[in-house]
Amino acid sequence: MVIKKPANKVDKKSTFKSSNKKKNPFKSSFLTKNKDLIYRILFTLLALIIIRLGVYITVPGVTLDKRFATDSSRIQFFQLLSTLGGGSIGRFSILALGVSPYITASIIVQLLSTDVIPVLTRWSKSGERGRKKLDKLTKIIMIPFALMQAEATIFTLSSQGLIIPGWDNTNAIANSAFYYILIPLVMLGGSFFMLWIADQITIKGIGNGISIVIFIGIIISMPSNLKSTFEYWVSNSGEEANIFFSGLLNFMIYISVFLLVILSVVIMNEAERKIPIQQTGSGLTDSSEHTPYLPLKLNNAGVIPVIFASAIISTPITISQIIEAVNPDSGFVIFTRDYLSFNTWWGISIFGILIVLFTFLYSQVQINPEKIAENFQKSGTFIPGIKPGKDTTKYLTGIINRLSVVGSVFLAIIALLPYVISKLTQLPSNLAIGGTGLIICISVAIQTVQQLKGRIIQQNFIEKKKEKFTNNINKNKTSHIW
């Protein structure tokens, strides 16, 4: 009898707890469990809304010509700037430069950090503190590139009559200091603001901020590109039925190939080589399903080689745009037009070669075979049939190089596809299938989804740990209550 009384008390407590659970049905819901994740998603959406609002603020002191939106999209320099800048060049916005100058500066800093300048190499290996120093240096180097791109934009648009100095077609500020000095400074400020927003997304939001900013700019432009493609194939085909249906068929083929290209990019992004590994003393496993492995992606470098190649090839084109406004017959302008323009086979080929080179270089940066081999030795891990140490390094280097060959060629084909199609069919390159923008969009989308999944799994793991800990405490209380 003495023992039963405490048991009744326990039953009352458990009944009380269970009744509480019924009264609070949202206690274990997704929203309450993942408050941090929901906050990050909402913060990212808010940041992107702010950027999209900024796109509609035109640079002060100019009037846009009616032909601006259509004609500016056909200029190669603006196509590259639009891809890397977040797509706001089409409105000559204060955010027109986007994060393009920062990307160009970061390429230079990364290249100089690879044992070229000892101080930068030391910073790159000194953890978070060194990374912050490199980031500050990148932002300083970004300033001249941003001003140069802004000047090139103004010179190019002015020479073609796409922007008119002054408000309401008044020529009050033409050739003045405001036009050639203050407007570039406004665009520089816009670029820094966009970079700050991108940094905030990285810290408080979801995904890599710079990638997300570029991604949203490209995605926003896709519906208008599809509309323009429909008009190119169907609306402008004339009133004759056979020509109309022929144009409609061409558009349907275009959409089908577009979807196939998206599917192929997704497959190539997810494809990986699984290298079986063993732990010293663990013994052999019975089936291949339970064998631990080292995953090496077919495209280890991701979208970075395409972005880097675009930034590199856009730099001489930027300088050329400024020189052309002053001296159209300059040798440098002619060289750029003949050998770096995507309207020529030379320009297309050089762009492809740059993508291949950057894929090989960045694959070695992303996956360091020496570091992996060293970590394997420390943890007692080895690849069956391969000796630890130098042999493992050599083996991994060979596999990474072979994967890079396939990955780099694939990236180059997809990135060059719109320019090749444009060259062969006269379809405007900004409307053609594939391209840098498509690769960036798919890669960023996949990475962001993976990060979301990772955060959800991490949060669920923490919740289970908390629940297990609480249950253990309750059990201890119950066992000692009498």
From Swiss-Prot:
- Gene Ontology biological-process annotations: intracellular protein transmembrane transport; protein targeting; protein transport by the Sec complex
Highest taxon of source: Bacteria
- Identify the stretch(es) annotated as Disordered: 1-22
Q: How does it sit in the membrane?
A: Multi-pass membrane protein
Give the signal peptide range: none
Q: SUPFAM superfamilies given for it? A: Preprotein translocase SecY subunit
Tell me, how does this one assemble? Component of the Sec protein translocase complex. Heterotrimer consisting of SecY, SecE and SecG subunits. The heterotrimers can form oligomers, although 1 heterotrimer is thought to be able to translocate proteins. Interacts with the ribosome. Interacts with SecDF, and other proteins may be involved. Interacts with SecA.
What organism, scientifically named, is this protein from?
Mycoplasma capricolum subsp. capricolum (strain California kid / ATCC 27343 / NCTC 10154)
User: Which keywords describe this protein according to UniProt?
Assistant: Cell membrane, Membrane, Protein transport, Translocation, Transmembrane, Transmembrane helix, Transport
Q: Protein transport: is it a keyword of this entry?
A: yes
What family does the Swiss-Prot or TrEMBL record give for this protein?
Answer: Belongs to the SecY/SEC61-alpha family.
UniProt function note: The central subunit of the protein translocation channel SecYEG. Consists of two halves formed by TMs 1-5 and 6-10. These two domains form a lateral gate at the front which open onto the bilayer between TMs 2 and 7, and are clamped together by SecE at the back. The channel is closed by both a pore ring composed of hydrophobic SecY resides and a short helix (helix 2A) on the extracellular side of the membrane which forms a plug. The plug probably moves laterally to allow the channel to open. The ring and the pore may move independently.
Mind telling me which HAMAP family this protein's record contains? Answer: SecY (MF_01465)
List localization entries. Answer: Cell membrane
Main site of residence?
membrane
Q: Which PROSITE patterns match?
A: SECY_1, SECY_2
Cellular compartments per GO CC: plasma membrane
| TM ranges | 41-61, 92-112, 137-157, 177-197, 201-221, 243-263, 303-323, 342-362, 405-425, 426-446
Which protein, by its recorded name, is this? Protein translocase subunit SecY
Does the entry feature the keyword Membrane, yes or no? yes
